[in-house]
Amino acid sequence: MTMVMNELSRKIILKLPYGDDFRFVDEISFVDENRIVGNYTFRVDAPYYASHYPHNPVTPGVLLLECMGQIGLVAHLVYIEKIYERENVALIPSLSNVQASFLLPVGQGEKVIVEATKIYYRAGVLKSDILLRNSSGEECVHAVAHLKFVENEK
């Protein structure tokens, strides 16, 4: 990743409306108006693994979708709207109309790569086709989702 992309990734992540305990984005490795690619490594010690299939822990599907939404929709919108360049703006996202297929489980400590392609962005709604792959490149989840958002002053 280039120094410019590294700095842009940092700026985008800082504008995401999530605290450290609920941010599922480690890095944005590519972004333009139509596409975004990022990654996240699920922590081995995350508390949900103790209760989600305790004898064979897997990452809950709702958290996979959250990761996909944070990278593929919210971070992409921060880029498209150039929110990363603006001061005193807070983004309030609302995920809706999600269609998802879960294809492979994601385990503890696994790094996932999320790639989203914009289908359209109009009237404050971003619709994207989003893929979540494991570090071997295997497709684990495929989703199409909409994101609506409101900007608030901080």
Residue ranges and their predicted role:
Residues T2-M5, R35, P105-K154:
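HotDog/MaoC-like acyl-thioester-processing domains
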Residues E7-S9, Y40, P57, C67, ...:
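RNA-interacting cores
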Residues T2-V4, L73-E115, C140-V144:
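Hydrophobic beta-strand-centered segment that forms part of the acyl-chain substrate-binding groove
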